[in-house]
């Protein structure tokens, strides 16, 4: 019998029943909730008179709508200026109180972005199935977990039954070998991958990231890569368990203790793909060939190395792709063959569930230390992914480095990743962003988003336009 992939092992462990239509009922170990996709689910439970199936499998925190300025975070929820945002955060509080769900409320130091606090608290563990009403739940796959986003109706289903009806996916292996050049990061790996296979390349697959480069990454770097598996079209991204995984989880609040820990570790060490496991598709990347990446268009696949130029649609033979390029360049206000380094920035955003962990902030601070944000940049902001990340950064003095350079130092939340809170782009403004999506209007109506790593965003803030961070730090 052929060996199993990591995805196959986790699927088999959690499959409760197989249905006549080919779908399966799988058990869910961890459910994470936030204020945007949960209200209708809770209301559905009330109307049906259903209790939660397993209360302690759920945790919650507000992140999408919370303001990130101190003025709106110092008081009660009444300090939230936007009435819709205030209502959503208040509703989450009330629902969690009513149903007994553990919530990291807005002014709890442990509050933060769902995909930051889950791993940070040890609520995400190897071997788990993890779901959340958010597409970037794939982040948690970095721990050898089977994690993906779900819709609001599925949120209700998980709350009521602790199970989910879903289809088994095919297996893809993305193998990255070699040593990353200095200044090239996990964000650059995943952007280069998306540039290679496109935003539909992973459709129908669970992607396992492997190879010497992936093994050399920190857990933060692995989370960045798994976070953007969805931008490559895959619902699931994952990395096999190793000693880094186990060391990261050890001692965290929700992690097993004592003899339970020993038993868990013994099980976790088997959460790797077997040597003879079959993958339906294999994609290979060489780390040495990857350069700092910058998106120039309105899809994550519209990406180039920083030393390249914006493509010319006239060289595209596919009429559909050509039209897409023309539209993207028009929206972004760019011309064919513009050097990437000629793109000037209005704003810089360092944050989001992709790049707001302590490692990300350290990388950005290293670049801006002793430098100043360019006078042409209207706003540069750093938004830590959680209150604990913020506190750690302040212990290390990173906040002072950013503030002295001219950055705004904010409270944790999703912030400018998406236009659902006060942090937004104005129409026509270009932003170097460490987030994960650059669709039209993603950061504000008419806003122009360029996805980059934290180090590249920091370098762009100082220069006022895109530069190769490797040259700046040489």
Curated annotation (Swiss-Prot):
Q: Does the keyword Oxidoreductase apply?
A: no
Q: Which GO terms describe its molecular function?
A: 3-isopropylmalate dehydratase activity; 4 iron, 4 sulfur cluster binding; metal ion binding
Q: In which pathway does it act?
A: Amino-acid biosynthesis; L-leucine biosynthesis; L-leucine from 3-methyl-2-oxobutanoate: step 2/4
Keyword Ubl conjugation assigned to the entry: answer is no
Q: Name the keywords, alphabetized.
A: 4Fe-4S, Amino-acid biosynthesis, Branched-chain amino acid biosynthesis, Iron, Iron-sulfur, Leucine biosynthesis, Lyase, Metal-binding
Classification via InterPro entries? 3-IsopropMal_deHydase_lsu, Acnase/IPM_dHydase_lsu_aba_1/3, Acoase/IPM_deHydtase_lsu_aba, Aconitase_4Fe-4S_BS, Aconitase_4Fe-4S_dom, IPM_dehydratase_rel_enz, IPMI_cat
Q: Which GO terms describe its biological process?
A: L-leucine biosynthetic process
Q: List the disulfide bonds.
A: none
Give the catalytic activity. Answer: (2R,3S)-3-isopropylmalate = (2S)-2-isopropylmalate
Q: What is its EC number?
A: 4.2.1.33
* Co-factor: note: Binds 1 [4Fe-4S] cluster per subunit.
Q: Write down the SUPFAM superfamilies for this protein, in alphabetical order.
A: Aconitase iron-sulfur domain
Q: Which cofactor does it need?
A: [4Fe-4S] cluster
Which of the seven top EC classes does this enzyme belong to? lyase
**Positions of [4Fe-4S] cluster binding:** 353, 414, 417
Q: What function is annotated for this protein? A: Catalyzes the isomerization between 2-isopropylmalate and 3-isopropylmalate, via the formation of 2-isopropylmaleate.
NCBIfam families for the chain? leuC, PRK05478.1, PRK12466.1
Describe the protein's quaternary organization and the partners it interacts with: Heterodimer of LeuC and LeuD.
UniProt-listed PANTHER family:
3-ISOPROPYLMALATE DEHYDRATASE (PTHR43822:SF9), HOMOACONITASE, MITOCHONDRIAL-RELATED (PTHR43822)
Report the sequence similarity comment from the record.
Answer: Belongs to the aconitase/IPM isomerase family. LeuC type 1 subfamily.
Tell me what this protein is called: 3-isopropylmalate dehydratase large subunit
Q: In which organism is this protein found?
A: Xylella fastidiosa (strain Temecula1 / ATCC 700964)
> What is the organism lineage in this UniProt record?
Bacteria, Pseudomonadati, Pseudomonadota, Gammaproteobacteria, Lysobacterales
């Amino acid at each position: 019998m052929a060996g199993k992939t990591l995805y196959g092992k986790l699927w088999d462990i959690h499959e409760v029943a197989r249905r006549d239509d080919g779908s399966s009922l799988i058990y869910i170990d961890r459910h994470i909730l936030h204020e945007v996709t949960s209200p209708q689910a809770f209301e559905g439970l009330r109307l049906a008179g259903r209790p939660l199936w397993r209360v302690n499998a759920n945790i919650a925190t507000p992140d999408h709508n919370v303001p990130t300025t101190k003025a709106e975070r110092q008081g009660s929820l009444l300090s939230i200026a936007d009435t819709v945002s205030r209502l959503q955060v208040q509703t989450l509080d009330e629902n969690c109180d009513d149903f007994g769900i553990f919530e990291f409320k807005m002014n709890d130091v442990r509050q933060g972005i769902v995909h930051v606090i889950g791993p940070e608290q040890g609520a995400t563990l190897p071997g788990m199935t993890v779901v959340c009403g958010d597409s970037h739940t794939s982040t948690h796959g970095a721990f050898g977990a089977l994690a993906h986003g779900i819709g609001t109706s599925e949120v209700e289903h998980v709350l009521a039954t602790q199970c989910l009806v879903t289809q088994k996916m095919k297996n893809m292996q993305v193998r990255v070998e070699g040593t990353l050049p200095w200044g090239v990061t996990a964000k650059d790996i995943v952007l280069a991958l998306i540039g290679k296979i496109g935003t539909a390349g992973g459709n129908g697959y669970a992607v396992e990231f492997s190879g010497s480069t992936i093994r050399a990454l920190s857990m933060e770097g692995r989370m960045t890569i798994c976070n953007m598996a969805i931008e490559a079209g895959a619902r699931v991204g994952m990395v096999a368990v190793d000693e880094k995984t186990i060391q990261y989880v050890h001692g965290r609040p929700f992690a097993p203790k004592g003899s339970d820990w020993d038993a868990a570790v013994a099980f976790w060490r088997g959460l790797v793909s077997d040597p003879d496991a079959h993958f339906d598709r294999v994609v290979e990347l060489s780390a040495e060939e990857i350069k700092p990446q910058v998106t120039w268009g309105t899809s994550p696949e519209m990406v180039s190395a920083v030393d390249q130029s914006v493509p010319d649609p006239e060289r595209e033979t596919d009429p559909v792709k050509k039209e897409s390029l023309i539209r993207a360049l028009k929206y972004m206000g760019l011309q064919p063959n513009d050097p990437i380094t000629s793109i000037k920035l209005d704003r810089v955003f360092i944050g989001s569930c992709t790049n707001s962990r302590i490692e990300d902030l350290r990388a950005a601070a290293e670049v801006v230390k002793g430098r100043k944000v360019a006078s042409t940049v209207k706003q540069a902001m750093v938004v830590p992914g959680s209150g604990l990340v913020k506190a750690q950064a302040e212990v290390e003095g990173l906040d002072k480095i950013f503030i002295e350079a001219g950055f705004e130092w904010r409270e944790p939340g999703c912030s400018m990743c998406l236009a659902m809170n006060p942090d937004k782009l104005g129409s026509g403004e270009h932003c170097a962003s460490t987030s994960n999506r650059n669709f039209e209007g993603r950061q504000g109506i008419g806003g122009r988003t360029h996805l980059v790593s934290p180090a590249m965003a920091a370098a762009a803030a100082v220069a006022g336009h895109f530069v190769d961070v490797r040259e700046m730090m040489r």
